């Protein structure tokens, strides 16, 4: 017996992988000739992550503590000691990743900055540049350099505590970004130098380097721009380089 998927499509066989929703999505994409513009992560049914999902790597040859319950365990993490004159120090080995003003509201960006301070972590600007309030509220702020370069400002770059050169991310490896016109408000359009009410489409690759050799040159350029003061990270999704 066939399963009804939509008014226009019939699913003849159902499996654990190709559910009615996935089959319908494939059919709609084929009909449109492009991807569907909609929210995925917030709409799909997903199990919330718990501490059970964390895997701690054991140190099997480390000295065994004589009184483990009394000895202090430090989670302090220092990044950038190899090249940067001013490394960053975090109280915990967890960082808040880049989420742009536009994808998130102004209040959400400021709240993330304050929350990062409370737990001793760092905050990241995301696409579209740096908010002044975000800089003021962040003890440790990472400036994200993306392929789009929307809102890029060399002065904001120098005001950051670290730089993140984004090659890709796990949420959308190998693809660019899209900020719908409904979110490109007057203030956001001004900061990103975009026409008001027009979709912002971000490319998947940087315009000024093509491969790993060129990327090294870009990193050196960023080091010179910041006088070798701050750490520089490279962010990429778990993909083939």
Predicted regions and their residues:
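Conserved, well-structured core domains of diverse proteins
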Residues: 1-94, 98, 103-114, 121-122, ...
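Alpha/beta enzyme core
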Residues: 114, 135, 149-241
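General beta-strand structural signal in soluble alpha/beta enzymes
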Residues: 123-126, 143, 165, 234
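Charged, often glycine-rich, active-site loop that binds/positions anionic groups
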Residues: 139-145
């Amino acid at each position: 017996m066939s399963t009804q998927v939509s008014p226009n499509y019939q699913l003849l066989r159902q499996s654990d992988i190709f559910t009615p929703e996935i089959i319908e999505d494939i059919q709609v994409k084929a009909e449109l000739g492009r991807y569907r513009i909609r929210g995925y992560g917030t709409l799909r049914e997903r199990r919330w992550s718990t501490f059970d999902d964390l895997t701690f790597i054991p140190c099997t040859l480390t000295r065994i503590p004589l009184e483990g319950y009394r000895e202090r365990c430090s989670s302090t993490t220092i990044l950038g000691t190899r090249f940067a004159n001013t490394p960053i120090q975090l109280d915990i080995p967890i960082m808040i990743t880049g989420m742009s003003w536009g994808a998130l509201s102004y209040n959400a960006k400021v709240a993330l900055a304050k929350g990062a301070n409370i737990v001793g972590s760092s905050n990241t600007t995301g696409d579209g540049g740096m908010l002044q309030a975000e800089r003021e509220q962040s003890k440790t702020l990472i400036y994200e350099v993306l392929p789009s370069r929307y809102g890029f400002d060399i002065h904001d770059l120098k005001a950051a505590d670290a730089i993140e050169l984004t090659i890709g991310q796990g949420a959308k490896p190998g693809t660019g970004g899209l900020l719908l016109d409904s979110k490109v408000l007057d203030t956001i359009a001004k900061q990103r130098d975009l026409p008001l009410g027009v979709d912002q489409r971000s490319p998947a690759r940087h315009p000024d380097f093509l491969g790993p050799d060129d990327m090294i040159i870009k990193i050196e350029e960023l080091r010179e721009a910041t006088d070798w003061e701050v750490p520089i990270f490279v962010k990429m999704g778990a993909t083939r380089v």
